[in-house]
Amino acid sequence: VESTVSKGLGSLFTLRHPEHGGKFLGSEIERSEINQNALEAGADIIDLEWGSDAAAAMIEKEAPIIISHHDFERMSGVLELKRMASEMEVCGPNAIKLVPTASTLKQSVQMLKWVEEAADEIPRIGFAMGLKGTCSRLLTMVYGAPITYASFGDAVAPGQLSMDSMMKQFRVTELNKETSC
């Protein structure tokens, strides 16, 4: 966190258990403490799993939080995405994030449409994992997401690109609906 703050970059902190694609093996109490320490060190926002005790603790503290849900196996249907979004929004986060796994490019486009349909009050972050989802990672901000996710180094999720690749190769900050078609 301190490294990104010293470089003038915004920072999002996430610490996940293995069942959610991470490597953290500690308790939810430990995770809540680490999240709080990250905020105190300068993290702008925390990304936690929907329904987790750590997410509930951070919301109770009125900490800046993104509530997220990942599906490492499949793409959710349109109605399922809407239902999950409604249930997540009720929790009162700063933003919600849904990231299913795409097996087709059409499914990646479905995620971009989901982002575009966001209510004004709670921003949506949405893209798809997997090789077929990579394009949605690049285009999600074009369709209204406040941020996208990239790695500093090796990918930590299927289809994830490095920050260097997003900025230099794909020039993600220059994309708009005219340049992305």
Over which residues does each language-model region extend?
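Short, hinge-like loop/turn segments at secondary-structure boundaries
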Residues: 28-32, 65, 84-85, 114-116, ...
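C-terminal alpha-helical cap/extension of soluble enzyme domains
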Residues: 106, 110-181
